[in-house]
């Protein structure tokens, strides 16, 4: 190994450029440099490493013995690194020069290439222009050649057509001398095409010379007219031959032959005759038995007596069979005809106009409004129900046919046209039907009432009573509900038959007006019947009013009759209150029906809903007016009984008890007890029957009448102080009862009565103090003071004069 003092040239090269290539690692380079000088650098576990020498006793180990060698090695390595860097720099300079030289050559080459490419592009442009010019020339030549060929073919065809035209122009009606083309069945399509061309040319020429101005043109025109006639005859004969062949193929179900004939026939009037002929020969249009079978299917086993439900089921079955038949025909039409949509349009139109219309004509026999069918046979309602189901099922059939195919046919408009005569008069028939049902129901109710009257018997004429019908003809909410159900059914028919909002609204208003009339008339008549019972009771009361100078027997009989009249009045009162309650329920049902069903149909049209509300308000007002009259009569009935009880039960001694030293009676008088019991009993039904303002106004009026009646009654008596106490007890009893009226004004009046009764209780000198707190009762109190039994003896009159003077 060289020593550290050796010159650098003596040291071998330790570094090379390859050491720095690839994945360079300084640790690996360092290890390679010092590997020989520092074998322990490889680690204790390095394979083949000799064990360290044993230490020498007494000698100090060197600190780092290889430092000089390493220092020389590192200096030498640094020098090598500098040399390597210079080599690399030199090589880089050489590479840069070479790159610059190559770049210059490359740029020069690119410049020359660009010039060559530009020249090449110019050459291509000139070549493209030349090719385009040659192409245009070739295209023109081709067009000329094609035009020439076309002209040649046209000329050839024209020659042939002129030849054929001359054949048709030879002799009128003579088709025997025609070319074989026109009689060859294998060339029918070609013959048809040529015949149509000749016919078109000849007809055009005849039309152009229709008014000849010269002899020559006239002769030419007459010659072509012969050709036109012969061509027409030939076309007709050819068309008939094709139709016959088409029919034969149709019977054999030879689709290809049918399609061939249909294609050829399409040249004659666009194939209209073939289409119409095919549709007309369908079995459902020519079989005479189909009509009778159809009507049997619709009516079922019940025959002419079939109801609308059976008819609806029958129509569903029949229309399904028709739709299936059309669907099968559509399959054939699609496979045979070149214009299947036109054929389907003709077929569907024929189905609706012939087969469906024939069925509907049998079903929808419009009745006469002047001579309505009997209600036992269904009346007008049967016709309307059948009309609705027929319209509904026919619309379903139309939708089904449209889904199959109907071409450009306006199937919806065609369906509507079938029913137009029925829809034009629908509203009149619906109104007449509702009136007929109402009249029938009223006749039924009258018959039931008569039967009930006959079964229960009549009140004997010996007691002077007449037969009443109010109990048998009471208002029924069930009947009103039935009216609403009729109207709801009619409205459902109306919305089914019509779709335009304005038309629907107009018809709905007319139909709803029938319900308003029916409910108003029924309720008003029911209230009038109930009022008749009140009138009858009033007549009974008036009949048995007698004078004072009669025998005991007559008086007893009259009293018994008055009791009977009172019982009749109470019964009539209850009946009328029940009638009013049912009226209120019926009107509520009517209003609910209007809100739920009628309103939504009227709101889309301006003014329709407010007008209907006004109509309903007018109808309800009529019922309310009748109810108001009856309620006033009820008050008269109650007050008449109150007056009778006051007259018969109130004794003079009730308020003028003898001064015998006995304790005063603080109980109400018998008349008061009887009246309060009567009012409690009779008004119980009124409390439950009346509601809201009706109840409030009725009880307020009754309270005012009761107050006035009691005042007038008490002015017939003379009162002692103890009688005044008893009067006050009566007033308290009456006041407690009328408090159930919930009428503050009535409560106040009876409270003032209680205060006013004090004029009979206080001493004469204390009367003036009674008016200080309540001056409003002064006028009535002054009248009551005169009823004191000591009015004259206590000189109360002079005392009152001084009070009035003050």
Swiss-Prot record:
Keyword Protein transport: yes
GO (cellular component) term, any one: cytosol
GO BP terms: exocytosis; Golgi to plasma membrane transport; protein transport
Coiled coil start-end: 77-109
Keywords annotated in UniProt: Coiled coil, Exocytosis, Protein transport, Transport
Function of the molecule: Component of the exocyst complex involved in the docking of exocytic vesicles with fusion sites on the plasma membrane.
Protein name: Exocyst complex component 5
